[in-house]
């Protein structure tokens, strides 16, 4: 009995120890759960960071694939590595979700259940133990009473005593068994907690193992990358193939830089020069409808630092730009398509140094260029053959006297005075802006945008009385600036809003083919808009890049002999604002000329005459072959007479800039000078009508049928 009691006491103590252990484990479980929650939060942040990292990694891989130097093998390997990392990131996301859904949340719920179950076990065990102990105590007391009676010898009590002792022993055995069952339940409860924890942990570990299994695939990829990038200083065959393929391709690189800083903040010429402009975002085939000129072709864009391949083009461009400077510098340095427009214009430089440099340049080109042996041509690819011209020595030899050395200075002074007029006001025109406006991309006076596709031509004269007068005495390819004093005379006659000008590619053809009225005289300069099949493209405000600005061209026309054998009525070789005339006897190179840049056609010829050797570069080289000795002498005389009149034009130009209009009497003495008639003899010198007389006479527009809302409305 005592032994059984001791065993029951030992079992009860064991049960109580187990229950106490379970109760003391609650803080540990709760701490684990909180730490798991923190891990889950960090893993979520890691997943987001991994997604951003892999997006950037993918861009690097794509760049390696598209870069010529990295080769596609490196890019492909990087792409595969990025894909493996994305798979790892997916498994990491699954592991993070499993950590929260399979471990943290269920474990938190089970901890509460475990607390309840442990308390219930303790209560049940205590209740059973007390009941058993109470029964044993009661039975034991009865047994003691029987023992006392048996000792006194009262009756036969021994069988009852033995039965009572057996009942007490049975009760102790029952209590012992009850304690053992209680201990088993406690052990099962404690074990069940860890089994449940393993059940919760299994999905988390499985997700982690799957994620780590993806990492093993990175070994082969990194081995391939190490082999591909073993020698960074040696080009692989794929990169060598890029160089070989480049030889047969046609590339034209354009290097463009922002223009110089504006002189004042109020100037419309100020541009966003502080912003980096894209190099080739402007389409070279799209006409600039609101600025009045065609965008610069990348073929003619010259880099700031010339490469070896540009040496020949620079030579030809210097030859082309020197033609206008030989006869009074009517075209500034930035008007040539191949000139560097990032340099300051002639109005931004000191006048003394500009004139001296131009004079030295003219003298140098006169000394180095050959005599007039043939006319140059302009090919479709933009390359120019150096054009020949009659040197001053040849003119002096044929004319009989030497040209005055001050003629060149007078010409440059006159041209500079006329070219500086475009600085006075640029509010009404976008021709001198850099291609953007504060409100709209159309001109300020235009009411609508001009689509690239049109169905008609609008033709209006800028030559005054076209019905009674002959060819004008200024160049037919001149472009009148909108904001000069010349344009002010036009505005007096046109009391309407300024139309948005258009520009396109010139096409060669006869006047009838271009829509010119048959009754129009050959000297009427027209501005016509040609229908285009290109889609409507509006110029962007600032993404189109800087636009080279061409200063106004005000050339002087040298009179020619209408009855000379080589003289034929001029024909159209251009269209729109770049109006140009050539002879009907032009060589077959004229169609190729029409395909060239319109700005190339806008350059006036050197002699400003229709029969000079320089015209052969525009209208073909056949004029030189047909010219006779008498014609050359007549041309020399015409040029000399033009130089003599330049002195008088200087005073008139300065007076014109001040608002006065004094004109030499020699230029407008007789009406026959304004309306020249064919002389009876080819050797007679026809009087010259200069540009100032045409300005004084004014301009009269001819009505045409058009439905273009941007065309000028003649009141």
Curated annotation (Swiss-Prot):
GO cellular component: cortical actin cytoskeleton; lamellipodium; plasma membrane; ruffle; ruffle membrane
Keywords: Actin-binding, Cell projection, Coiled coil, Cytoplasm, Phosphoprotein
Gene Ontology molecular-function annotations: actin monomer binding; GTPase activator activity; phosphatidylinositol-4,5-bisphosphate binding; small GTPase binding
Feature: compositional bias, Basic and acidic residues: 360-369
Role noted for this protein: Involved in plasma membrane dynamics. Potentiated PDGF-mediated formation of membrane ruffles and lamellipodia in fibroblasts, acting via RAC1 activation. May function in actin bundling.
Sites of Phosphoserine modification: 261, 404, 542, 564, 575, 587, 597, 602
Subunit structure: Interacts (via IMD domain) with RAC1; this interaction may be important to potentiate PDGF-induced RAC1 activation.
Compositionally biased intervals (Polar residues): 331-341, 443-455
Biased composition (Low complexity): 253-274, 284-295, 312-330, 429-442
Biological processes, Gene Ontology terms: cellular response to platelet-derived growth factor stimulus; lamellipodium organization; membrane organization; plasma membrane organization
Record-stated family: Belongs to the MTSS family.
Cellular localization per UniProt: Cytoplasm; Cell projection, Ruffle
Domain annotation WH2: ranges: 687-704
Protein name: Protein MTSS 2
